[in-house]
């Protein structure tokens, strides 16, 4: 495979899957713009990668898409080969426990922000015959219920529908769209969503026992697939949602 340099955007790149994806692209020499809310974690993501740049912005801010567009012009040569819509927010709680702020925050980050950012980047994506990768969730696949995390799951299920619909809409413009649906990945997201560390550790242990491969995933497990899907050899793949979950979603 010819190792040509690509221009890549990764949202939610300050930790977890986003950090692993950004580092994986940067390690192969791609120009990477890592987007996230907080400058410090973003700086840690790009440390040691001279072609990686950061943009600290809340992706739900109405001004965020145009801020990214400006960085594309200044840092990425005006083209986008790969856009990874990874930024996510989860708030655990059953229906009677969620307030409006928690509901709207999850929909804004997990569903609305990818729509508006992808829309803003259509021209640089088309110029590059680019790829959009939407990071969903294996928990949103199929017909399995997800009590306590239903709003997050509903938003991620909506993202999967966007993946399939955009593949049809944008294919004539030379843009591919693929979904990657991680299973239970050890990212610390549960603690950030309100779980205690003890509860989160117990959750990971229990889920690892349910996964056919016998363990929960690592961020690098997901990043490997995202990078491979951007390779020229994958150029005929579009509209699919790939579960990276150790087989959990088919149990």
From Swiss-Prot:
Record key words, sorted: Antibiotic biosynthesis, NADP, Oxidoreductase
Classification via Pfam families: adh_short_C2 (PF13561)
Catalytic residues (UniProt): 152
Catalytic activity: aklavinone + NADP(+) = aklaviketone + NADPH + 2 H(+)
Coiled-coil annotated spans: none
Keyword Transmembrane helix included in the entry's annotation: no
Residues binding NADP(+), per UniProt: 58-59, 86, 152-156, 185
GO BP terms: antibiotic biosynthetic process; daunorubicin biosynthetic process; doxorubicin metabolic process
Gene Ontology terms for molecular function: oxidoreductase activity, acting on the CH-OH group of donors, NAD or NADP as acceptor
E.C. code: 1.1.1.362
Alphabetized SUPFAM superfamilies for the sequence: NAD(P)-binding Rossmann-fold domains (SSF51735)
Disruption phenotype: Cells lacking this gene accumulate maggiemycin.
Pathway: Antibiotic biosynthesis; daunorubicin biosynthesis; Antibiotic biosynthesis; carminomycin biosynthesis; Antibiotic biosynthesis; rhodomycin biosynthesis; Antibiotic biosynthesis; aclacinomycin biosynthesis
Thylakoid recorded as keyword: no
UniProt function note: Involved in the biosynthesis of aklavinone which is an important precursor common to the formation of the clinically significant anthracyclines such as carminomycin, daunorubicin (daunomycin), rhodomycin, aclacinomycin T (aklavin) and aclacinomycin A (aclarubicin). These compounds are aromatic polyketide antibiotics that exhibit high cytotoxicity and are widely applied in the chemotherapy of a variety of cancers. Catalyzes the NADPH-specific conversion of aklaviketone to yield aklavinone.
Family: Belongs to the short-chain dehydrogenases/reductases (SDR) family.
Protein name as catalogued: Aklaviketone reductase DauE
Gene from which this protein is expressed: dauE
């Amino acid at each position: 495979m010819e190792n040509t340099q690509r221009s890549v955007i990764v949202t939610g790149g300050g930790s977890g899957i986003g950090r692993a994806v950004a580092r994986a692209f940067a390690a192969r020499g791609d120009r990477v713009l890592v987007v996230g809310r907080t400058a410090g974690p973003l700086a840690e993501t790009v440390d040691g990668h001279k072609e990686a740049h950061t943009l600290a912005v809340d992706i739900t801010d109405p001004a965020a898409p145009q801020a990214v567009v400006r960085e594309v012009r200044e840092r990425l040569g005006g083209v986008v080969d790969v856009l990874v819509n990874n930024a996510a927010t989860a708030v655990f709680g059953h229906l009677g426990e969620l307030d409006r702020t928690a509901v709207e925050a999850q929909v804004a980050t997990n569903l609305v922000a990818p729509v508006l950012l992808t829309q803003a980047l259509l021209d640089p994506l088309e110029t590059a015959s680019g790829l959009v990768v939407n990071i969903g969730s294996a928990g949103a696949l199929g017909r399995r219920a997800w009590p306590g995390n239903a709003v997050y799951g509903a938003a991620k299920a909506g993202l999967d529908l966007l993946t399939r619909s955009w593949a049809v809409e944008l294919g004539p413009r030379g843009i591919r769209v693929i979904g990657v649906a991680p299973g239970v990945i050890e990212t610390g997201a549960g603690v950030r969503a309100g779980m205690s560390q003890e509860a989160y550790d117990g959750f990971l242990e229990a889920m690892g026992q349910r996964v056919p491969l016998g363990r929960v995933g690592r961020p690098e497990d997901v990043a490997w697939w995202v990078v491979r899907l951007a390779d020229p050899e994958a150029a005929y793949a579009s509209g699919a949602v790939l579960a990276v979950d150790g087989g959990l979603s088919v149990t």
